[in-house]
Amino acid sequence: MDAIFIPQLTKAPERTEEIQVEEFLPGLETLTPVRGIIQVKHQGNYLEVSSQAEAIITCTCNRCLQQYNHRVVLNTQEVIWLDANVNQTEDLPLEREVAVEDLLETLAPDGYFYPSEWLYEQMCLALPQRQLCSLNCPGILNTVQGIPEEPIDSRWASLAALKKQISDN
């Protein structure tokens, strides 16, 4: 996917660009290419970016370590503010307090928007945090049979004798 020059969006029909996606994203291991659509709309002082996409990934169950396939479905929308001072690095203080409402995605209004990077980030956010092959997954089963009842280490013999003496009383 090519980068979008943000000022060019103002000349597009309805100030919108739609990108059909059917490709493997670098850094995201999927069995199928990411398929979907990204829509980038210039709204004056912000970009409205939305996407519907899906791909199939191979996960490893956190309980039993079995591998299974999982469909990642993305249906998201994000506002990216356009700020001319976003790349200003001169005369910055050593420390700066940032309010919660300032923790927003911003781009320079004369810069570029990279849809492949944005889609990669959104797909990573959509990955399941708890990876379970099924809700009833029992975990790793102990299949070792014939474990002796008596401890192998003779140093535990006195403890076993004490336990037997207590249980007899």
Positions of predicted regions on the chain:
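Short, non-ligating residues that shape and space the ligands of small metal-coordination modules
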Residues: 70-71
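A positional/architectural concept
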Residues: 1-60, 65
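Charge-rich, low-complexity linker and terminal segments
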Residues: 1-8, 79-169
